[in-house]
């Protein structure tokens, strides 16, 4: 037995043998040497290239600008504004004569040119490109007419929400973030969406008495499709991080309906339903689609009618200016013949003092008393909106009057870009909440929008200029100096003694007049 046991070969595990026919070969495992431990490399900081130059200075001779800049101690002459704000001016004693030239206005903005060209391609027409501006016409419906209009507003919003729910169900944008191209073709086509929503549309028309016009419901479907398109293009071009289009809130403050031009007849719209309609202006010569808006706070019905402004020639002066927006003065304007200071911040605080006191009181009541009735909450929120609206109306009045004054006196305006978003952010702890509120009330971004629109209307070029190094640079010699909180710029090299904001406005003008400067 012992000999038999000796002759038995031990079993080899399957992992350690390779079968090749009848023979077996043992697999040899060789231990590899561990790799030499190399010292870890420190992460190299990537240097981000910036386009910002080290200096923005350009000599006055190269741009053909005079060295004149007034001293801080000067007497301003007041300009009549017919409003609550102050507008002061100081003229150059050695004023040079200004040349005049003829210019055809209004100038059509490039965005509207693109839209009109696309419309001509789609409709296969050769309509001339025109300058379009909206006209406000207020209407005064009776109580019975108001009831009909309110049902129409509700049905328009309901149809809009139904179409957006239908489009979202097609899953155009997937969870991964990619876009389903096949689904976009179906969704972006208004006719295919109308066919899919036909049953809902017919039920809505039959439910109303008097019945709503089918074209008004179709406009709601078209508006939903166009809004979805714009949101999709913004997502593709990375203007927005997340694709999200939400339905309308049925109890929102502002409600709209879109009415076609064919419905405006006999001084009214939809004459079978509204045979007579009182309005602030006659409802005639309407050849484009109109939007009717209702504001629940003001309880006003307003028609926004697009109008074509005809072209005409105007005598313009060859006079350019630089504008520095700031916190001491709303605007500081510099040109070769004069300097202007528009609306000191103290006047803004005094005019909006009562409104903000009431706003703070209402906010305290809402915070300290959370268990309020729904009616009480609605009243308080309505009061908040009322006082905020008063402040915005005051700013709106100032914006339009100031922009009209500037556009009529200058043919080129270079305005500094003020990044208000970063200033008002919570991360910025340098500025106090009171200063942030002042900046928010002045709303510089809205002013630049209104100024550019008025510039196109009256033939004035508006250039947005980056404010980098405009306050620190001497406009006469180009030396850079850190001012801190001082209001006066005193140059040590050339001896220039001027106001801080006026020096910045002159630098903004010089940067905007550079022939190689491009808007960013």
Curated annotation (Swiss-Prot):
Where are the compositionally biased (Basic residues) regions? 21-47
Keywords on this record? Answer: DNA recombination, DNA-binding, Metal-binding, Transposition, Zinc
Region called Disordered, residue ranges: 21-52
Binding residues for Zn(2+): 474, 477, 491, 494
Record keyword Zinc present: yes
Q: Does the keyword Metal-binding apply?
A: yes
Q: Which GO terms describe its biological process?
A: DNA recombination; transposition
Q: Which GO terms describe its molecular function?
A: DNA binding; metal ion binding
Homology family? In the central section; belongs to the transposase 2 family.
Task: Indicate what this protein is called per its UniProt record.
Answer: TnpB-like protein L79
Q: What is the native source organism of this protein?
A: Acanthamoeba polyphaga mimivirus
